[in-house]
Each structure stands twice: as C-alpha cells, then as structure tokens.
Amino acid sequence: MRTLLVGIDAACFPVLDPLFEAGATPTLDRLFADGVAGRLESQIPPWTPSAWPSLYTGVNPGKHGVFDFLTFDGYDWDVVNHSHVREHALWEVLDRRGLSSVVVNVPVTYPPREFDGALVPGYTAPEDPECHPAGLLEDVRAAIGGYSVYAPGELSDRDRGETIDGYREAARMRGEAFRYLADRFDPEFGFVEFQYTDTVFHELPEDDGAIRAAYAAVDEQIDAILEECDPDTVVVASDHGIGEYDGYEFRVNEFLRNRGYAETTRGGGSLPSWSSVVRNNLMRGEADADRTPSPLERALDLAARVGLTSQRLGAALEAVGLDDLALEYVPDDAIRAGTERVSFPESAAYMRSRIECGIRLNVAGREPEGVVAPEEYDAVRESLIEALREVRTPDGEAVFDAVLPREAVFDGPYVEDAADVVLVPADYDHYLSSLLLGDEFGEPWQSHNHKRYGIVAAAGAGVDASAGVGDAHLFDVAPTVLATLGVPASERMDGRPLPFVEPVGTERYSDFEGDPAAEAVDRDVERRLSDMGYLE
C-alpha cells in the first residue's frame, strides 16, 4: 500500500493532547511526533454528513451538493447518501488513473459507485448495505466473524459498560475488515474511518474513561493496520473538532416567529419531531381538521403552550427509559398535537434543520408554496441578516461570529440547495436549535458541540516534516493524498496540496455524471440521527 488515509471523526488537539500525555494512544502519538501535525480548519457547517464528502472530494458543498444529514425537495426530505454527492471521490479519481483502493466505514459512501477496489460504507448507510463489489459484506462477515455498520446494540438500552464495549467492537470490526480487504485486493490507496470517537461525546460526554477507551481501541487498530499493511505514507485527518458548550441554546425559529417570519402548526408541513422519527411514519402528513381531538391530544396541546413539546418530552422519557414504552401506547395524533413546529408553506423564512446552520427563505416559484416574491428576495434576506447580526445573548455577547449570504460561503452548481442565510455561532459555543419552546434562549440540550478545528498529520515517504501544515483546510486533504500518489489534483478542487508534500499540479477531470439520487431505505438511520441530537 502506497498511501493510507485514516479518518478519526471529531479528533482535535484538546481531545488528543491529554490522551498523548496519559499514554492512551501511543500509535497516534508516535505518528504525530515522527511526522508533521497541525490544526485542520473544517468547513461551514462543520458536521459529518457534509464535511466527509468535502474531505474526500476536495470541493466545497456548493460543488458536491451535500449540506446536511438531510436533503430537501421542496418541503419534503430524505437522509443523504452517496448518490447525493455529485463529485468524484478520491478513490474514483484514482480509478481513472489506474490505481486501486480499499475504503472502509467512510460516512456518506452508500450506495457505492463502480471503481477498482472495495468499499464497505459507513455512517448514513443502512445496517446491511450494498457494498462494492457485490457480495463483499458477506465475505467480510465470514472472514472476521461478523460486521455491522453501527455498534452492536446501539438502538437498544445499554449501560455504560455495554456502550464502551460497543465502541471497542466497532473499532475492531473496522480494523479487521480493512486489513482483510487490503490483503485481498492489494490496493495502492487505503482509507479507513473511525466514527465512535465522535459518538462518545454525544453519549458519554463527561466520561473521561469512556473517551479514553474509545480512542485507545482506535489506536490499537491503527497500530495493527500499520503493522500488516505497511503503507509508505500515512495521512491522518478529522472532519471537525469537538468541545464543551460555553454558551446558550439559541432557538432560531422562535426568533423568526417573534419577528413575523415564521408561522407555526401542530400538524404537518414541517420536519418530523423526535416522536415521528422514531415511529418512522410522519413525513409531510396533513392533520385531520374534521376529527375531534382526544383528551390526550388536548393535554399535550396545553403542555405545548408552556413549552413541553414532544421533542423535549421524548428526551425526558428516554432519560428514564420510558421512551419506547410511551411510543408503543401514545397515538400518532396525540404526538402531533404536542409538537409545535414551523409551517414551511405558510412561513417567509425558517430553519429547516439545525445541522444546516442556516435559514431558508420560502420563495415563490422556487418552493412549492413560496410566499416571498422573487423581487423581494434580496431585501428580505438582507433584513434578516442585519437582524441576526445584532442578536445578543442574555449576557450581552454576540451570538454569531458571522451571518452571511450563502454565496459568500459556497460556490458551485448546487448553491441553490443551500440555506439562503448561513449562521456561524461565536466559537461554535452556542447550540442552534430549530425547536419552538417559547423563549429564544435556553440551556443547551447537549453538553458538547462540533468545533471548527480538527487535525491533520502525516508521516512516511515524501513527507517533509519541517514544512509544517500551513493554514491547512479540510478541502486540502484530497489533493494532498493525490500528491502522495503522484496524481494531479482536479481543477475543480477548492483545496491545494499541503506544504509537507510535493505538488503534482492540476488536471481537468471529466465532469461528474452520477445516477439519480437513491432514496434512503433504512429508517433506523433517522433514529440514530435523532438519538445523537442531529434531528430534533
């Protein structure tokens, strides 16, 4: 193997440095010390579903088309997958140069496209995904004694020990699958990603022992991969960093409602709540206006008026282990009654998904039932931007480092799919929520948040450790990896090879021509996103 790329979700120096000092991750510590390492600036927004495609294509979301865990068609939505990534991935570029690849567990790679090599998909794939080549998953399971995309028991009730065991088992499966496939296919390029280094901060965020265990398991697998695959060059990268919140929860749709931009409903026409994601049966359903509300519906309606919506009720029930029991007996219509949400068709502007970090205008002729006239678009958007730039926390601090029109952040053929206004929270210390809970500010629902800076490191052949990483950006990873293999970067790439490798120049590659987007088929993916706080 000539080049190995190791992806470690959410890895950053505030997390790694204490682990290095404690001797918990000796393999990573040695790689960082023997080669070159530094901060890697992530993109906007710095979240898994968009950032990993940016890393493995070298282009911004406006060029590859994925901005969120969700993709939208008018007011309807689906979970993103690889068919929504409309640019060539690293392994597809290498295929066109006659080089083979093995790719394991990289997010947003299902369903795989044809290339020379092997691919087992990662996050956002269903549990039994199609792999490349066909039948590969069965071979992997037979070879290593089982394989799952997600940690065993992830959707069931687990205690701390079982959760940590799940992290270890997930790391083992990634490492053993990668080594088996590398031995079988003998690729020039290998890419393996470890996801639970992020998940641990959502599930056990204050548990230093759990964090150490998750990273130690990954470090052990990296060591085994290096020993068995003996790559000439190793690159390590993350999609973003992670850290504690030090601010507030800012409820964007509450802000918009209070200023007359957003209208609300307790029926359909919006994103699903906690309850509907778990039940997997409310997409854009319409409320039945002719039916008499049940006593439970009326009670939940009253609760919603004082801020107890089903989203937070779901979190409270889950905390005491009653969420599944409640969902078994609470009728769908009662859930709808207790879920106050933005009505997309009736609103001028709304946050459709918190992971998107932005606001979408409901424009006539663009959205199915748009209310903002095209000639008013610029004025409405500028007014929104000015108002949001002035928002202050209860402590008098600015909520946002920047509030920008989308074209100031993204460029490319898919900018039209992005939010119209992009929000950059101050130091990413504020939790942006799409929920309607009465007050614009509250305590963050989660203790940790993605941060703007991850890591990049490299060691081995062709790496000039004295050159440093410069102002390394997420978009630079793909052209850097190509340079280690002597392959020119695509002219469409927004990144450039980092200073520690010798650039090979650029080349015009064929335009991307993909198949129509595939619909998500495993609603357990939605539940996982909901459990992690990515869907509210």
Where are these regions (language model features)?
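A long, amphipathic alpha-helix that forms part
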Residues: V15, T163-G190, Q195-V236, H240-E244, ...
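Polar, surface-exposed loop/tail segments
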Residues: D395-A418, V469, G486-A517
